[in-house]
Amino acid sequence: SYFVPGVRLQYLQKPSRQLGFILGHQGEGSLLSYLKNQGWATSLYAGIRSETKEYDYAQISIELTEKGLEEYQEILGVTHSYIKLMKKAGFQEHVFDELKTMASLEEVYSNKGEGARRAENIANELNMYNFKDAGRINYAYGDPKPENFDSLLSYFTLENMLVLLSAKGLKTDKEEYHYKTKYSYFENDSLYLALLRDKPSHTFELPKPNSFIPKKVKIPNREIKDNIKPRLLINNKNTKIYFAKDHEFLRPKGVISYKILFPKNKMSAQHRAFLKIYIECVRESMNEVAFPARLAGLSYSLFD
């Protein structure tokens, strides 16, 4: 984690969201993709937590494998290699534009909540933001300011870094007073800093323009009707395909669902176990492709 100046008042540019977007990206060439290929990590989260108007803290959280735990110093070096690439590349205008586009779509079509929770959210935001933007802070965007992004990223340095390593079996030499939690604390010496700084360059890529982001959204004119039944398009020995047009919610989205039926005598307990393993393998192998689609509001699910 890194302590950074408060970015709450930069909500129209959202440099913290851009930074978390790039660091936490899971597509091809990303930091997480590299860590997975090395067998070091299974997931990664990056973002900035707003504490006060004066300061926030940025966090990169990586879930390690057993192999990754052994190589955690190497992972720190790799992470800072990626941060160096971000600093060299600077502000990514297409990332800002994509976040702005998706925010505008979410503002129009997402569920905003209602009742007491909605009122409480607006009241809280009235204490911190302009009246006209209260209730829509997550969706509000102004003109980009690259200097805000670059300034925020400049605080991602080794000298400003706090590393927390949490796992079973770690050696500790201290005990917390109130809860008796075992822990250790030490500050990096020059050798440790040299280990982090002197890393070879890795094959990283910053997020490319996302082809899944819609350029425009259009809903065909439809009258709200009751008792609309799905229409059977294909009906043969092996396949049945239905189609149903939405006449109620009028959202720019659709759902395609496939159900594959196996003969009961072909699905033993062993086959079901293999199927679950296969599903997890498909999900993992599809992640680099599916992640950009998820950012655009698309998704898929695979289950037995």
Mark where each language-model region is.
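Mature, solvent-exposed C-terminal subdomains and processed small-chain segments of exported/organellar
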Residues: S1-D304
